[in-house]
């Protein structure tokens, strides 16, 4: 056991040697999938005396936490000569209350579930938009019992129920990904290449947050869609992750009078589902590494009837946003049901119905097309845990209540 521990200390200490670029490693070619990430972390992570990087070697808890601390807390992490090489990282992470769920041996491989828990705590309060804000979160119409229901909870990955909150946050922040079979493998360790990829994404987001005031929203092809604030306005732009290079300015929204800057920033987008991105600056479709705008006005929810007909919920943010008890904490509520035919240069936009300002239930949140009929859901919160939802048929310029309204 002593020999094993000594070997662990020797190998791990190599992480803290003089930095070199990825091009100098004998076993990391410029075609390696993690080449750019390893090179990006040349100041934080190093190789071995024989000139190798060993990208497939497993990373221990102490190694991962040391690299994490150097990136997340560069002004606090400090290696003291004569002390164990991992001690400063553990002290810094403990001071920031990041190690509550990390209790295993320092020399053992750090599992992905623990990495997710670490990143969840560190990223708490960051203002990105969850990828899960999609159709899976809509109210479900229960026609038989004539009521609206919350959707059945679906985990982001098939095997991560124990870490669902940690995995959701770290994945939605673009830091961790799952496997093609839908699993996350929370008990699996990470290799040096995988650790470099995870921590390179973290470092790049920290740089964009600090230098440009950006918040990660989602990934579009090879780029990151970021939110940024600028002189009372909030915008969207695509950035190249590791270089921070601006690729495409997507949209700009100026906060209406009376809407706080934080609220405007937090709610710039309503959702992203892997194909579309939507919110205050409109509706966009992912197309390779770019976003193509379909609707220029605010979009809270949408559905396609066919290839040329789009229905969506919109609102006028120059008016007072419906302020039922719960909505201010989540998404704004739409006030108009819209139809867009022939999206593109010859698009025809029609207002199908508008919210009845006297009805507290008509805070529109979801839109549906079933068997050729258009419906919209509205909700109202009477208090904590007391949420009511109603279903309306959109017909003849009106919202006709079918059930749930009181």
Residue ranges of model-derived segments:
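Bacterial N-terminal signal peptides
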Residues: 9-18
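N-terminal propeptides
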Residues: 18-215
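Bacterial N-terminal signal peptides that target proteins for export
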Residues: 1-7
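Short glycine/acidic-enriched loop and turn motifs that connect beta-strands
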Residues: 229-233, 282-284, 316-321, 330-331, ...
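Repeated scaffold domains used in trafficking and secretory/extracellular systems
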Residues: 212-219, 257-270, 297-307, 360-370, ...
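Surface-exposed loop/turn elements that mediate protein-protein interactions on large endomembrane-trafficking
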Residues: 235-254, 282-296, 324-354, 388-406
């Amino acid at each position: 056991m002593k020999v094993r521990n000594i070997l662990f200390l020797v190998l791990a200490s190599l992480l803290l040697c003089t930095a070199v670029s990825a091009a100098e490693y004998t076993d990391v070619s410029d075609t390696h999938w993690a080449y750019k990430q390893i090179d990006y972390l040349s100041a934080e992570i190093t190789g071995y005396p024989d000139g190798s990087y060993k990208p497939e070697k497993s990373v221990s808890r102490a190694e991962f936490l040391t690299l994490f601390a150097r990136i997340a807390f560069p002004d606090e992490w400090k290696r003291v000569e004569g002390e164990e090489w991992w001690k400063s990282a553990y002290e810094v992470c403990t001071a920031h209350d990041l190690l509550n769920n990390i209790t295993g041996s320092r020399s053992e491989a750090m599992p992905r579930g623990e990495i997710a828990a670490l990143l969840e705590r560190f990223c708490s309060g960051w203002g990105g938009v969850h990828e899960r804000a999609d159709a899976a979160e809509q109210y479900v119409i229960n026609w038989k019992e004539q009521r609206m229901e919350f959707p059945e909870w679906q985990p982001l990955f098939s095997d991560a129920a124990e870490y669902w909150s940690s995995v959701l946050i770290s994945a939605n922040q673009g830091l961790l990904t799952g496997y093609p079979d839908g699993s996350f493998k929370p008990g699996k360790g990470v290799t040096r290449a995988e650790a470099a990829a995870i921590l390179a994404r973290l470092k790049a987001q920290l740089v964009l947050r600090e230098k440009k005031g950006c918040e990660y929203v989602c990934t579009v092809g090879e780029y990151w869609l970021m939110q940024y604030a600028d002189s009372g306005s909030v915008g969207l732009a695509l950035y190249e992750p590791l270089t921070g290079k601006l690729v495409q300015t997507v949209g700009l929204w100026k906060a209406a009078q009376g809407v706080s800057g934080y609220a405007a920033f937090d709610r710039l987008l309503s959702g992203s589902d892997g194909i579309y991105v939507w919110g205050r600056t409109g509706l966009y479709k992912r197309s390779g590494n770019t976003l193509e705008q379909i609707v220029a006005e605010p979009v809270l929810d949408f559905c396609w009837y066919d290839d040329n007909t789009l229905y969506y919920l919109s609102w006028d943010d120059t008016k007072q946003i419906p302020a039922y008890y719960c909505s201010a904490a989540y998404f704004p509520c739409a006030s108009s049901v819209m139809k867009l035919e022939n999206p593109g240069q010859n698009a025809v936009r029609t207002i199908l119905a508008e919210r009845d300002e006297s009805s507290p239930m008509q805070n529109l949140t979801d839109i549906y097309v079933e068997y050729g009929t258009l419906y919209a859901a509205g909700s109202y919160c009477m208090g904590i845990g007391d949420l009511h939802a109603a279903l309306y048929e959109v017909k003849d310029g009106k919202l006709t209540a079918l059930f749930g309204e009181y």
